[in-house]
């Protein structure tokens, strides 16, 4: 590694990682508060976490328009990192809002939940800001280890325990690929700095250097697992179904965005000279991921498994924009990840409300009659389903438009057509939920419990985030385009 300890301390600028510092300190403080201030209700921890998340958000946005590095150029604060940090903080905030009601109902509202969410967010933010392979790995491991705990957080649920174990075993396996790839790249180039790797790629032979090529593909394998791209998606349905629903919501949005953030910075900064090699691989994986995700989702009755396969398909849409290598496609990924955070977590918030203790109401059929019994809740779910399907005038439509436009600009017209066809196929299973809500009578009377204020706030924010960017996309697109220019 290119790190000299004396130089490292001279280059430390805590303002660059102030959001991470805020959440880290708060997370450790909440762990202590949870131990020394016992309380049956953990709601106060949720609100303290939200305050910290908002504070971290303010600390992040104040750096917009600047590019400052720290820790001997291991991390950077730029528009790209800030954009993704906002996505992570939104995902964390929404997950916290929908967690207390669910965890209290399931009698697993342990106080450690909220600090672990904060630590996961710190790991994701490090991945977006990292400009060194080892910093990327540090952020990824902090995120992953925290996610393993969140997946198995309901200790009384066999499915939750199984989800945590599966995620841990397969995640550790994928991390091995990632780390071995980094080792090969370091062995070939002699550096772990992303920018320096770019300047050395041509010197060491580029794609003609077998070790460099293998190292790049091994790293990609690790990231593709994190974003749940086929054929590295097999863990997703079981983990999403077994994990506590608020944690599934968080896992489906934040880590996926973190994986794309690290991939974008790594491939576009370190390996632009090898774009022909990784672009060909990505469009193949994009087609496979979209198709596997959508056509498997068509057969699902369990709504969490349906959204799990849907999540795989959405990773495929983003890979379309990635494979294009264009500014339009890349900014489309940023826009889409932000929109996806709102619409997907919003859908899971509705699942939290419809479910009962033990989650027996996990099928699409259980939503029959919801439009008559809880019209506002059904309306919110309709917005989320339309946005996930990419129907105008939602944010999902605009996001897919820019992803596929990037492919067309790069000459991948056929790839854009495949993307549109896959998106059309997905309409079936999203509309199926809406049909059951409005046109199928409920077979039994459910004792719908009240919607608490935090969950209601999460639903309102998610619905607004799913609609407003679709109606007025220019502002967010402008921010996304500014973020992409700096990588």
UniProtKB/Swiss-Prot annotation:
Major localization class: membrane
Enzyme class: translocase
Disulfide bonds listed in the record: none
GO BP: any one term: ATP synthesis coupled electron transport
Record membrane topology: Multi-pass membrane protein
GO cellular component, one term: plasma membrane
Residue stretches spanning the membrane: 16-36, 45-65, 79-99, 111-131, 133-153, 168-188, 212-232, 257-276, 281-298, 306-326, 333-353, 378-398, 413-435, 457-477
Protein name, per record: NADH-quinone oxidoreductase subunit N
Gene name of this polypeptide: nuoN
